[in-house]
Amino acid sequence: MNCRSEVLEVSVEGRQVEEAMLAVLHTVLLHRSTGKFHYKKEGTYSIGTVGTQDVDCDFIDFTYVRVSSEELDRALRKVVGEFRDALRNSGGDGLGQMSLEFYQKKKSRWPFSDECIPWEVWTVKVHVVALATEQERQICREKVGEKLCEKIINIVEVMNRHEYLPKMPTQSEVDNVFDTGLRDVQPYLYKISFQITDALGSSVTTTMRRLIKDTLAL
């Protein structure tokens, strides 16, 4: 199986990290979640509805849509908060990345553990810029909103392609494809990881700083 890989880059101020990452992760999971499966008998099932809600950002001029699942939101906020704190405490240039990997399980014979086979990975490279004035922060608030809108549109375009998705499982195999542990939504199996690094390059950070300077010069 070929694993699809998508890479996004964002440049943000420190206080915007959490909102920007939640916007991206929630958007991807909105398109990679279904309602809960309700099996009547093997091979026959119904799918519940997936509720959505708008989220207005506090530090970015942006509104995104997420699945209205508090459990899913808490799970994402926990790992994004850890990423934010790691960036803040890195003492470096504020460079890091988060990866959202979708996978399915392949059962293995005892005593071996199940094999996790990735089929789609989203990587978001994050560059944190330091701003000196409130005027710069206001400009960054607007510019990041514009750039984030472009990223969300890109995500939706990718999701609309007719590419591989795991086939709908039978009742006995549903846990090999979906995370059934949430009460109100059923995302494809996923895991999130992050790393802090000083080797991601500075092209996006430089672009954001140039955008701010150009706007100030007007």
From Swiss-Prot:
It is found in: Cytoplasm; Preautophagosomal structure. Residues 152-156 are annotated as: Important for interaction with ATG13. Signal peptide: none annotated. Its main location: cytoplasm. Keywords: Autophagy, Cytoplasm. It comes from the Eukaryota. GO terms for biological process: autophagosome assembly; negative regulation of cell population proliferation; positive regulation of autophagy. The keyword Ubl conjugation does not apply. GO terms for cellular component: Atg1/ULK1 kinase complex; phagophore assembly site. GO terms for molecular function: identical protein binding; protein kinase binding; protein-containing complex binding. Interacts with ATG13. Associates with a complex composed of ATG13, ULK1 and RB1CC1; the association with this complex requires the presence of ATG13. Belongs to the ATG101 family. Autophagy factor required for autophagosome formation. Stabilizes ATG13, protecting it from proteasomal degradation. This is Autophagy-related protein 101. It comes from Bos taurus.
